[in-house]
Amino acid sequence: TGTNCRATVDGNYIDNCFIEWSNEHDDEPEFNSEFSFSQLNISNNIFLASHVAPWFSYIILKPHGAGHFINGLNVQGNFFRIIGGTIERVERIDTSFADTNFSRMRNITWRDNMYNAVDVATVNPLISTHSQETESDKWIVSGSPQLPFGGWARKVEALVAEGPIRNAVNVKRYEMPYVDLAQGADNDTIHVNWSQPVRGDIVISMRMDTPL
């Protein structure tokens, strides 16, 4: 129930329960030049639940005041499984009192987890393959819905072509594109920009946070 919790949840069997991270005991819960939600490690746990509603989640962030963000979270090496149905995703933000500031998310690692009967396998950084079949000078690559907490596409760590990039007359292009971050109505897409309309395949690694 504190933001800068300095806690590790490691090696547990978590049966029909969830982790809720809140600041409900803060008498001034709005963000005010502090660390915000930080220093939480959730690793190597077995999460199991049965016959739950599709909106059930195992990891819930619940800010009780406006302006907060995540400033250090590691979720790695966990098993997530549902019996007797499926759930939409394993994590969510409870906005009963306030939402979070997605533009300030920082130092979030969410990887090497395993999912069964979960619609969306969350990961950060997200490695995505994009195939552009028709020539365009702007390729739109979405990070939704796999970025944690429905986060913004805020950083690109790497971008590489898988095979040749070709223009409308089938000539190979060797240029390096540039990207526009946090695009679209939900800020969850990347625009990959070229000097001319081209087609091809790329692999892109994107994040919903600012890494250290």
Show where each model-derived region lies.
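Extracellular parallel beta-helix/beta-solenoid repeat domains
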Residues: 1-211
